[in-house]
Amino acid sequence: MDKAKKLNIEEAFCEYLAKNFRGAVNPVSSKTLEAIFHVKGTEIRRIVNSLRCKGEPICSDLDGYYYADNQLEINATIAQLSSRIQKIAQARDGLLSCANEES
Protein backbone atom coordinates (compact mmCIF):
# COMPACT_ATOMS: atom_id res chain seq x y z
CA MET A 1 0.00 0.00 0.00
CA ASP A 2 1.49 3.34 -1.00
CA LYS A 3 1.89 6.26 1.40
CA ALA A 4 -0.98 8.35 -0.04
CA LYS A 5 -3.39 5.43 0.19
CA LYS A 6 -2.32 4.75 3.80
CA LEU A 7 -2.99 8.38 4.73
CA ASN A 8 -6.39 8.33 3.02
CA ILE A 9 -7.51 5.15 4.79
CA GLU A 10 -6.24 6.51 8.11
CA GLU A 11 -8.20 9.74 7.64
CA ALA A 12 -11.33 7.84 6.63
CA PHE A 13 -10.92 5.43 9.55
CA CYS A 14 -10.50 8.23 12.09
CA GLU A 15 -13.46 10.17 10.72
CA TYR A 16 -15.61 7.03 10.70
CA LEU A 17 -14.84 6.27 14.35
CA ALA A 18 -15.29 9.89 15.44
CA LYS A 19 -18.71 10.13 13.76
CA ASN A 20 -20.10 6.69 14.54
CA PHE A 21 -18.34 5.17 17.54
CA ARG A 22 -17.79 7.75 20.25
CA GLY A 23 -17.21 6.64 23.79
CA ALA A 24 -16.66 3.32 25.52
CA VAL A 25 -20.41 2.66 25.49
CA ASN A 26 -20.35 2.47 21.68
CA PRO A 27 -17.39 0.37 20.47
CA VAL A 28 -16.98 -1.29 17.07
CA SER A 29 -15.32 -4.67 16.62
CA SER A 30 -12.19 -5.21 14.59
CA LYS A 31 -14.12 -7.68 12.40
CA THR A 32 -16.65 -4.98 11.52
CA LEU A 33 -13.89 -2.49 10.70
CA GLU A 34 -12.10 -5.12 8.61
CA ALA A 35 -15.26 -5.64 6.55
CA ILE A 36 -15.95 -1.92 6.13
CA PHE A 37 -12.40 -0.96 5.14
CA HIS A 38 -11.57 -4.21 3.31
CA VAL A 39 -8.38 -4.82 5.29
CA LYS A 40 -7.12 -7.49 7.69
CA GLY A 41 -6.88 -7.20 11.45
CA THR A 42 -3.16 -6.50 11.27
CA GLU A 43 -3.88 -3.45 9.11
CA ILE A 44 -6.57 -2.24 11.54
CA ARG A 45 -4.02 -2.44 14.35
CA ARG A 46 -1.43 -0.60 12.23
CA ILE A 47 -3.95 2.16 11.46
CA VAL A 48 -4.95 2.48 15.12
CA ASN A 49 -1.30 2.64 16.20
CA SER A 50 -0.48 5.28 13.58
CA LEU A 51 -3.46 7.43 14.57
CA ARG A 52 -2.61 7.14 18.26
CA CYS A 53 0.97 8.17 17.51
CA LYS A 54 -0.43 11.27 15.79
CA GLY A 55 -2.44 12.13 18.90
CA GLU A 56 -5.89 10.86 17.90
CA PRO A 57 -7.80 9.55 20.94
CA ILE A 58 -8.52 6.10 19.53
CA CYS A 59 -9.29 3.80 22.44
CA SER A 60 -10.03 0.12 22.75
CA ASP A 61 -11.26 -2.48 25.17
CA LEU A 62 -12.46 -6.08 24.96
CA ASP A 63 -15.53 -4.96 23.00
CA GLY A 64 -13.68 -3.06 20.27
CA TYR A 65 -12.42 0.33 19.20
CA TYR A 66 -13.95 3.74 19.80
CA TYR A 67 -13.15 7.44 19.64
CA ALA A 68 -12.70 8.69 23.21
CA ASP A 69 -15.29 11.00 24.68
CA ASN A 70 -13.34 11.89 27.83
CA GLN A 71 -10.02 11.65 29.64
CA LEU A 72 -11.11 8.63 31.71
CA GLU A 73 -11.50 6.58 28.53
CA ILE A 74 -8.07 7.67 27.33
CA ASN A 75 -6.57 6.82 30.74
CA ALA A 76 -8.11 3.33 30.61
CA THR A 77 -6.50 2.67 27.23
CA ILE A 78 -3.17 4.06 28.46
CA ALA A 79 -3.34 1.66 31.43
CA GLN A 80 -4.12 -1.24 29.09
CA LEU A 81 -1.16 -0.35 26.85
CA SER A 82 1.16 0.04 29.85
CA SER A 83 0.18 -3.41 31.10
CA ARG A 84 0.93 -4.91 27.68
CA ILE A 85 4.32 -3.16 27.63
CA GLN A 86 5.18 -4.69 31.02
CA LYS A 87 4.14 -8.19 29.92
CA ILE A 88 6.13 -7.94 26.70
CA ALA A 89 9.18 -6.73 28.67
CA GLN A 90 8.83 -9.71 31.04
CA ALA A 91 8.71 -12.11 28.07
CA ARG A 92 11.78 -10.42 26.57
CA ASP A 93 13.63 -10.64 29.87
CA GLY A 94 12.78 -14.34 30.17
CA LEU A 95 14.17 -14.99 26.70
CA LEU A 96 17.27 -12.94 27.48
CA SER A 97 17.94 -14.96 30.63
CA CYS A 98 17.50 -18.18 28.65
CA ALA A 99 19.91 -16.95 25.98
CA ASN A 100 22.45 -15.90 28.64
CA GLU A 101 22.31 -19.34 30.28
CA GLU A 102 23.07 -21.03 26.96
CA SER A 103 26.05 -18.77 26.21
Predicted regions located by residue number:
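Short, amphipathic alpha-helical interaction segments positioned at domain boundaries
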Residues: 73-95
